[in-house]
C-alpha cells in the first residue's frame, strides 16, 4: 500500500516554496512515499500564482498539487498580518476535511501524516478527526523557534506579560541562544498589546501536540539552538533537514531574469553588492533616497531590488519601483556601475560570480541562500523575526556585518532613517574587507558544511532518515 503525506503550507512565497521543495526531497529519498500539497491562494503575494503554474506545468511523479478554493480577500483586509493565516486556515477547514476524508477512505493509500506550516497548526483538529499523526514545519530557524517556545512558556506557565519587553533594556536568557538576547531584537508581533501576541503564542502551544517538528536548518549552522530544543522534554522531537532551497528557480520570470543576469555577466568578479529586502521589503521615499546616496558615494557596483511601499490593507504586492522615489539624476549618474530592478531572481543572483556582497533583510530563506552560496551579508532587518535573525547572524554565528540589526519597518511606519553616510561606510566594509576577512572565511566554510549536511550521511540526510523511521 502506498504511503501518503499531506502538506499544508502557508501561502506566502518563502513558506510555500520551502514546503514544496521539501516534498520533492521526501519523494526522492523514499520510493514508497507520495505527497499531496494543499495550496490556498493568497491575495497579496502574486509570486505564488507563477510558482503554482510552474509546478503544474512540470509535474513531479508522486507529488500532487491540490488548489483549495479561493477565499474573498475582503475578509482579511483589516486583520493584522499575524492573524491573517490562522483565520485563513479556519475558513479552509471544510475543504481540508473533504480532502482528508477522500484520502483516508482510499484502499490503495495509507495517510501517514499531516505536515502543517507552524502558522496553520489549528488544522490539527481536522487531522485528529481521522486519527492522522500531525507534524509541524518551521520555515524559521532553530534559534527563533526556541525563542518562541521560551516566550510561550513565560506567557502561559509563568504568567509573565511578555509585551512588557517592548522598549525595555532587558536582556533575556533564551535557551536557544548562547548570548543574552536584548529585548530590542524580539519580533514586534510578540510585543503587541492588542492581543496579537496571544494569537501567535497560542500556535506554539499547539505545536507541542505534534509528533515532530521539521526545521529548515542544519546542525552545523545552529548547533547550540538545535541542542537546546532537543534537551527540552516539553518540545516534540526536532528534525533539522535543511537547507531546503528552490535551487532550480521555479516560478521565476525567465525574461526578466535573463536581462538581470546578462547585466551581471558584464561585471568583474565579486564586484557587485546586491541589495534585496524580501517580498514585503519596501521603504518610505526619504529612506530610499538615503540608500541611493549611500550607494553612489560608496563607489561600488550595485544591483538593487527596490519595491514600492505596501500599506496595511492592500491586496497585492507590487513588483516594480517608481523612478520618482530616487534622487534626481541618480539613474543617469550610476548607469555605468549600477542597476535598479523590481523583482529579483535572488538565488541566481547570489550564485553569480560577479556578486561579492549581499545587503539583506535577513528573512530565514535569504540567510540559508547566502550560506549556501558563501555570500557575506550586511544585515538590514525589516519585520517579523528578521531582527532576531540579524542578531543571530552577527552576534551568535559571526557570519555577517551589520548595517542595522534592530531596524523595524512594519508597513512603512518607521520614523527612523538610516543615513547615507552609515550606509556608505557599511557597504565599503562589506565589499572591501577582501577575500581573507574573518567573516568571508567563516561564510565559505559554512557553505561547504551546508552542502555536506545535505549529502549522503550528512547531518540533515541522517535527520531525514530518522524522520522516515518515525513516519513510516
Curated annotation (Swiss-Prot):
Disulfide bonds, paired cysteine numbers: none
Residues annotated to bind an anthocyanidin: 15, 384
Catalytic activity of the protein: (20S)-protopanaxadiol + UDP-alpha-D-glucose = (20S)-ginsenoside C-K + UDP + H(+); (20S)-protopanaxatriol + UDP-alpha-D-glucose = (20S)-ginsenoside Rh1 + UDP + H(+); (20S)-ginsenoside F1 + UDP-alpha-D-glucose = (20S)-ginsenoside Rg1 + UDP + H(+)
InterPro entries listed in its UniProt record: UDP-glycosyltransf_plant (IPR050481), UDP_glucos_trans (IPR002213), UDP_glycos_trans_CS (IPR035595)
Recorded consequence of changing residue 205 to R: Normal ability to transfer a glucose residue to the C6-OH of protopanaxatriol (PPT)
Family (UniProt): Belongs to the UDP-glycosyltransferase family.
Protein name: UDP-glycosyltransferase 100
Species in which this protein is naturally found: Panax ginseng
Amino acid at each position: 500500500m502506498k504511503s501518503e503525506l499531506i502538506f499544508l503550507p502557508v501561502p506566502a512565497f518563502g513558506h510555500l516554496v520551502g514546503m514544496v521543495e521539501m516534498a520533492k526531497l521526501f519523494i526522492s529519498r523514499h520510493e514508497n512515499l507520495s505527497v499531496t500539497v494543499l495550496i490556498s491562494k493568497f491575495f497579496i503575494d502574486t509570486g505564488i500564482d507563477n510558482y503554482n503554474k510552474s509546478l503544474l506545468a512540470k509535474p513531479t511523479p508522486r507529488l500532487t498539487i491540490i488548489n483549495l478554493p479561493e477565499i474573498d480577500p475582503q475578509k482579511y483586509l483589516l486583520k493584522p498580518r499575524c492573524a491573517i493565516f490562522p483565520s485563513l486556515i479556519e475558513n479552509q477547514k471544510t475543504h481540508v476535511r473533504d480532502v482528508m476524508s477522500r484520502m483516508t477512505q482510499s484502499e490503495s493509500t495509507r495517510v501517514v501524516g499531516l505536515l502543517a506550516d507552524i502558522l496553520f497548526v489549528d488544522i490539527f483538529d481536522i487531522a485528529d478527526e481521522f486519527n492522522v499523526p500531525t507534524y509541524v514545519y518551521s520555515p524559521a530557524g532553530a534559534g527563533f523557534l526556541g525563542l518562541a517556545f521560551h516566550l510561550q512558556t513565560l506567557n502561559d506557565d509563568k504568567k509573565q506579560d511578555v509585551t512588557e519587553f517592548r522598549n525595555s533594556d532587558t536582556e533575556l536568557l533564551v535557551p536557544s541562544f548562547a548570548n543574552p538576547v536584548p529585548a530590542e531584537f524580539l519580533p514586534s508581533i510578540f510585543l503587541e498589546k492588542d492581543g496579537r501576541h496571544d494569537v501567535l503564542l497560542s500556535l506554539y502551544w499547539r505545536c507541542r501536540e505534534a509528533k515532530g517538528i521539521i526545521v529548515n536548518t542544519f546542525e552545523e549552522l545552529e548547533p547550540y539552538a538545535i541542542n537546546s530544543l532537543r534537551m527540552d522534554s516539553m518540545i516534540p522531537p526536532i528534525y533539522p533537514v535543511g537547507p531546503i532551497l528552490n535551487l532550480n528557480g521555479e516560478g521565476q520570470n525567465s525574461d526578466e531574469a535573463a536581462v538581470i543576469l546578462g547585466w551581471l555577466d558584464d561585471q568583474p568578479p565579486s564586484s557587485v553588492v546586491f541589495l534585496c529586502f524580501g517580498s514585503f521589503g519596501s521603504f518610505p521615499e526619504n529612506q530610499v533616497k538615503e540608500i541611493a546616496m549611500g550607494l553612489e558615494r560608496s563607489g561600488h557596483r550595485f544591483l538593487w531590488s527596490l519595491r514600492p511601499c505596501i500599506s496595511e490593507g492592500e491586496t497585492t504586492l507590487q513588483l516594480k519601483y517608481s523612478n520618482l522615489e530616487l534622487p534626481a539624476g541618480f539613474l543617469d549618474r550610476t548607469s555605468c556601475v549600477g542597476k535598479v530592478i523590481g523583482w529579483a531572481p535572488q538565488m541566481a543572483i547570489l550564485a553569480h560570480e560577479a556578486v561579492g556582497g549581499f545587503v539583506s533583510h535577513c528573512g530565514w530563506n535569504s540567510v540559508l541562500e547566502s550560506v549556501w552560496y558563501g555570500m557575506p551579508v550586511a544585515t538590514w532587518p525589516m519585520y517579523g523575526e528578521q531582527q532576531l535573525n540579524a542578531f543571530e547572524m552577527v552576534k551568535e554565528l559571526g557570519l555577517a556585518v551589520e548595517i542595522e540589526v534592530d531596524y523595524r519597518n512594519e508597513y512603512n511606519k518607521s520614523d527612523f532613517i538610516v543615513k547615507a553616510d552609515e550606509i556608505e561606510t557599511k557597504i565599503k566594509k562589506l565589499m572591501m574587507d577582501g577575500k581573507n576577512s574573518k567573516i568571508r572565511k567563516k561564510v565559505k566554510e559554512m557553505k561547504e558544511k551546508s552542502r555536506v549536511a545535505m549529502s549522503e550521511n550528512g547531518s540533515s540526510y541522517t535527520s531525514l532518515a530518522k524522520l522516515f523511521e518515525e513516519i513510516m
